């Protein structure tokens, strides 16, 4: 039986990254591949606020081949590679306002056998409890760069409303001056799949 697909509308993403990051918590991230469909509930995100955010790739409106998609319309997929891992971001805000939300962790839902094959020798908790881990488990690649997050094969659906959301500093941005202390990481309080 094929699952019904009901992606969130593009208007959902037309807000600042600081507003979008917590609103994505509890939503279902879905990736369809030739091997099958895998999905998980988003449990951790980080907001990157663009021109004035030293931790953002688009700080000072820096435009490169890699960051160009951050200047596009809200709802575009921004993938990049860090330490051989693909990381998944969703572009926020309006065109030419280069903001994005990094998806840091998901709670596995569909396609858990696929995730296990893609993340062999690891416990279920370790399949998706980090930004490079979840993309491997779902099958997200650089080929997804620039897609609409509202269309197959990579999209987000509504899920559940978290009982509580925690905030704190973003991870791995020690060289970003005062921006390293901004409480722009959001996670579902107490969820075991949060990265740390």
UniProtKB/Swiss-Prot annotation:
GO molecular function terms attached to this record: alkylbase DNA N-glycosylase activity; DNA binding
Gene3D superfamilies to which the protein is assigned, alphabetical: Methylpurine-DNA glycosylase (MPG)
CDD domains: AAG
EC number: 3.2.2.-
Entry keyword set: DNA damage, DNA repair, Hydrolase
SUPFAM superfamilies with a match to the protein in the record: FMT C-terminal domain-like
Chain segments annotated as coiled-coil in the UniProt record: none
GO term, biological process aspect, one: base-excision repair
Protein name (Swiss-Prot/TrEMBL): Putative 3-methyladenine DNA glycosylase
Family: Belongs to the DNA glycosylase MPG family.
Domain of life (superkingdom): Bacteria
InterPro entries noted in UniProt: Formyl_transferase-like_C_sf (IPR011034), MPG (IPR003180), MPG_sf (IPR036995)
EC top class, as a word: hydrolase
């Amino acid at each position: 039986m094929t699952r019904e697909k009901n992606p969130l509308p593009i208007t959902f993403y037309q807000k600042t990254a600081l507003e979008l990051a917590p609103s994505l918590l509890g939503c279902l991230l879905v990736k369809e591949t030739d091997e099958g469909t895998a999905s998980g509930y988003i449990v951790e995100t980080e907001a990157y606020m663009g021109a004035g955010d030293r931790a953002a790739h688009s700080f000072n409106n820096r435009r490169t081949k890699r960051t160009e998609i951050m200047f596009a319309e809200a709802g575009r997929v921004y993938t990049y590679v860090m330490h051989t891992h693909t990381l998944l971001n969703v572009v926020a805000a309006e065109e030419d306002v280069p903001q994005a939300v990094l998806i840091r962790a998901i709670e596995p839902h569909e396609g858990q056998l696929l995730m296990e094959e893609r993340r062999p020798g690891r416990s279920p908790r370790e399949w998706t409890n980090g930004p490079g881990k979840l993309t491997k488990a779902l099958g997200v690649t650089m080929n997804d760069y620039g897609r609409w997050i509202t269309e197959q094969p990579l999209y987000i659906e509504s899920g559940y409303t978290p009982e509580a959301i925690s905030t704190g500093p973003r991870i791995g941005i020690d060289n970003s001056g005062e921006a390293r202390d901004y409480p722009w990481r959001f996670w579902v309080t107490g969820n075991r799949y949060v990265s740390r």
